[in-house]
Amino acid sequence: MRVSRRTGTPRRSRDSGDTVAAFFTVTENLLKTKPFQDITVAEIITRTPHSRSSFYHHFDGKVDVLVALATSVLDNAYRGPGLWDAQPGRSRARAMHASIGPTIAMWTDHGDVVGAVIEQMHTTPVVAQVWKETFDKFVTAVSAQLTQQWIHEEITFPASSATMATILVCGIERTFYVSSRGLDRRLPAPESAVEAIEWITLTAVQGRKPQNMAPAAAVFSPQPHLERAIDGTSTARAEQTDSTADSILDALRSLLLEAPLDKVSVAKITARAQVSRSTFYFYFDNKNAAFAALYRGLAEAAAAGLRRLHTIDRTNASLVETTLTEWLQIDDHAVAIMRSALHEWPRRAELRTVYREGMSAMADILESILIQDRTDGVALAGPPPDQFAAVLLWTVERSIAGALAGEDHLDDLGQVISSLSALLTSAIYGR
């Protein structure tokens, strides 16, 4: 089998199966121990009985191995009639539910491969195309179901059915990614997210409280980790800075308005901040550490914005939706930081820690609100509040990432924000 870089699809020969399978197995095993960008072709080859010439007979490089391996995983996961083959209506609704099973199996058995694809898709177009083909099939199928249901039930959302379908599929993608990678304590495994995913999907499809899902317990006891969210104290580590460190971060912030993080160097930062290289390294270990500090400030501001929900009358759904919309609004400087953060955090260790802290702080806040409002009878009984809060926020996070990347059906950031606000309000409080 030889992979075409232009199409990302393998050309098979009858006698190549065992050789290719060996390269696949070694690559998948390596992905369990290190990120894809740190794997070399030499590592792949030396862990098989095959030669370098044999490797290059089948592949142009390690990216081609990932493309072919991911293609195989996706083909096997969704082999046979799929969600997209069912007719819109009850048949497709059943197929939407049934598709969760093979999706969980794929992430459970091959999460390292699919995770590597997710991490590389914003920087490597041929990898992105592999994922996009399956992603788009789900979006098209869910969009058709939404269109039919909305017309029949006279339901409206701020966005088109294609945009809402994309938001739903984005949420599922990101939720399974973080749960399979162990990146969110609220979602220890893909199975833990299923109830929340189905609730959110049915909210979009039905536009009201999902009728065919058993409600969770109506009363929950706050956990110790939630008390910090309720009293308004930030859980993120405080940064000790002075005016020089602030100047460095301001310089980085302004450079991000001009270029993504990959294109910003320490030399450019020091020149813009008018400090020496040694001064930069006195405050920060490297560029990634400086960006992590910059993002921490943004994450703390985002948590403070979400905390405003504690101060409003949440029996007023319109006020809740307005507050959520205001929380999600992003100015130009924040867009520049978020665009790099959203796309880079899975691949950069320094940023990943800070990013998870920020997401966890917001989940604490939303979970505490869910518990309080369910206890007071304001919010709908639904999925467990810890898992529900996590899935809602990862859906927001991935959808905003897609909007900032200009992905299909998410190119209008304002519409995406309005849709997310409406979806969260409906999922938590009903229509």
Task: Give the location of each predicted region.
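Short helix-capping/turn signature of helix-turn-helix
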Residues: 59, 119-124, 284, 343-348
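Helix-turn-helix
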Residues: 30-64, 68, 255-289, 293
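Secondary-structure edge/capping motif, primarily at the C-terminal ends of alpha-helices
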Residues: 81-88, 114-121, 149-153, 175-183, ...
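C-terminal peripheral helix-coil segments that are non-catalytic and often amphipathic
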Residues: 1-7, 140, 144-148, 166, ...
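Short, amphipathic alpha-helix enriched in basic
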Residues: 17-43, 47, 224, 229-268
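Amphipathic alpha-helical packing segments from all-alpha helical-bundle domains
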Residues: 105-109, 115-118, 125-151, 162-166, ...
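Hydrophobic/aromatic residues within well-ordered alpha-helical segments
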Residues: 19, 23, 62, 69, ...
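Hydrophobic alpha-helical connector segments
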Residues: 64, 68, 82-109, 161-168, ...
